[in-house]
Amino acid sequence: MADLEEQLSDEEKVRIAAKFIIHAPPGEFNEVFNDVRLLLNNDNLLREGAAHAFAQYNLDQFTPVKIEGYEDQVLITEHGDLGNGKFLDPKNRICFKFDHLRKEATDPRPYEAENAVESWRTSVETALRAYVKEHYPNGVCTVYGKKIDGQQTIIACIESHQFQAKNFWNGRWRSEWKFTITPSTTQVVGILKIQVHYYEDGNVQLVSHKDIQDSLTVSNEVQTAKEFIKIVEAAENEYQTAISENYQTMSDTTFKALRRQLPVTRTKIDWNKILSYKIGKEMQNA
């Protein structure tokens, strides 16, 4: 082991540490970070070399953050990344600094949004917040409006998590939806992601995603937002149902094919009455 450590360069050590951090399960960033810190045993090297991994983790996980003085949380995503550690809160029209290690937002300041698409963004956000409130007990959403390749584009992100460390499981739902504002009809593109980690008496992870495409009729802002939410709701309901049914099927068929739940005799052994069994008598006479 000592020879292996001598062979690894600092660059290689940091690369391995960063990989562990980026793939930390939902709600377990601190635990993974602390373990990696002990293994690396060099705080300066970890901070300088793996800082990009801290940022990538928060961007990938749609990490929600509360900004002091503002009611609603905002998601940390690539769509709100303004560079130099600053992020956009489109609802409140502010930008703020974000510490990727501490997961804290500071220094909120006014920020002018894309005026040309703001009315569309606001309509979609209003409809999406109502939907998230109805379907996600701990849900947070952020809606962006921006020009991409000259086209006015709406990007809607949803995050919801349950961290139950005392019960040995954590999970997170993420979904991202995007469409351009074009006359008559447009294409909606979405991706849905679920990640769950269960680690009591074992280590089981569910990592699943699904890509969605659908067409959306574009009329006025309010009606378009309503039609967009119908697409989101139908797709996310179908995905959740499919995941649940798939695991029920696995429980009923696949797992049973791997291992018998009961012995060949189809009866469970009553260990309290083991001495009444023939094998128990033989054991007693032995």
Swiss-Prot record:
Positions bearing Phosphoserine: 9
UniProt organism field: Felis catus
Q: Which family would the database say this protein is a member of?
A: Belongs to the F-actin-capping protein alpha subunit family.
Acetylation recorded as keyword = yes
What is the protein's name according to its record?
F-actin-capping protein subunit alpha-2
Q: What does this protein do?
A: F-actin-capping proteins bind in a Ca(2+)-independent manner to the fast growing ends of actin filaments (barbed end) thereby blocking the exchange of subunits at these ends. Unlike other capping proteins (such as gelsolin and severin), these proteins do not sever actin filaments.
Pfam families associated with the record:
F-actin_cap_A (PF01267)
Cite the SUPFAM superfamilies for this sequence: Subunits of heterodimeric actin filament capping protein Capz
Q: Which UniProt keywords apply?
A: Acetylation, Actin capping, Actin-binding, Phosphoprotein
Q: Does the keyword Translocase apply?
A: no
Provide GO CC annotations from the record. cortical cytoskeleton; F-actin capping protein complex
Query: Which InterPro entries did the record assign?
Result: CapZ_alpha, CapZ_alpha/beta, CapZ_alpha/beta_2, CapZ_alpha_1, F-actin_cap_asu_CS
Provide the positions where the record notes the PTM N-acetylalanine: 2
Single Gene Ontology MF annotation = actin filament binding
Q: Which Gene3D superfamilies match?
A: F-actin capping protein, alpha subunit, F-actin capping protein, beta subunit
Subunit comment for this entry? Answer: Component of the F-actin capping complex, composed of a heterodimer of an alpha and a beta subunit. Component of the WASH complex, composed of F-actin-capping protein subunit alpha (CAPZA1, CAPZA2 or CAPZA3), F-actin-capping protein subunit beta (CAPZB), WASHC1, WASHC2, WASHC3, WASHC4 and WASHC5. Interacts with RCSD1/CAPZIP. Directly interacts with CRACD; this interaction decreases binding to actin.
Biological processes, Gene Ontology terms: actin cytoskeleton organization; barbed-end actin filament capping
